[in-house]
């Protein structure tokens, strides 16, 4: 999608960008309210996830990650903004009268036709099992367990690659660089998720980030020693440690946070970068 730069003398929007080709008028039968629990706080009101809070009210869009309409062609009617994710979503009108949302594949435009099922064409936006895809296919919205819906490669610009098939398993290279095994019966969507340049978008002002529910981030080196291990000192002092740490004293860079002896370790052939 093309990004447009605000042309205004107002300082608050001088550097902001906006995508004018995306609508934001969801259908009433495909949305519902969603209670945002605490916004970074636990049941006692204590902050457990920093830099979260505030933000505009949101309505949840029901996304069809399972692609339930099998062997029924659908047409892309609109490309819409979703406040719950970085990727855009598409409203699909199916041949049997049903309507639903899917993630917007990169390059898809209004009027394109998509379909899901077995033995369907290998074209952008179509969903089919991994066993029916040739090696080297770029895919997204990948199932881990058959029938549970896509769980991998769903963020804006995400794309995975099918690199091998052996027995009942397929080998995928995920956006993180991880190489793992997935059952060949699992569904995946052909192509890359749209809105690739989301990380290049300029919000223009701090208030725009507050609307997204993101609070300011303060460096530990400017805090007091009681608040952060990097804090304290006279003037602009260094952190006073060999390596950076988290506010709780754990190593901040390079520390492995994945749970040991997890059931899915046997499916991971190479860890992420």
UniProtKB/Swiss-Prot annotation:
One of its GO terms (molecular function) is structural constituent of ribosome. InterPro entries: NA-bd_OB-fold, Rib_uL2_dom2, Ribosomal_uL2, Ribosomal_uL2_bac/org-type, Ribosomal_uL2_C, Ribosomal_uL2_CS, Ribosomal_uL2_dom3, Ribosomal_uL2_RNA-bd_dom. Pfam families: Ribosomal_L2, Ribosomal_L2_C. GO terms for cellular component: chloroplast; mitochondrial large ribosomal subunit; plastid. Coiled coil: none annotated. Its main location: plastid. Gene3D superfamilies: 2.30.30.30, Nucleic acid-binding proteins, Ribosomal protein L2, domain 3. Keywords: Chloroplast, Plastid, Ribonucleoprotein, Ribosomal protein. One of its GO terms (biological process) is mitochondrial translation. Residues 1-20, 225-273 are annotated as: Disordered. SUPFAM superfamilies: Nucleic acid-binding proteins, Translation proteins SH3-like domain. It is found in: Plastid, Chloroplast. Part of the 50S ribosomal subunit. HAMAP family: Ribosomal_uL2_B. Belongs to the universal ribosomal protein uL2 family. This is Large ribosomal subunit protein uL2cz/uL2cy. The gene is rpl2-A.
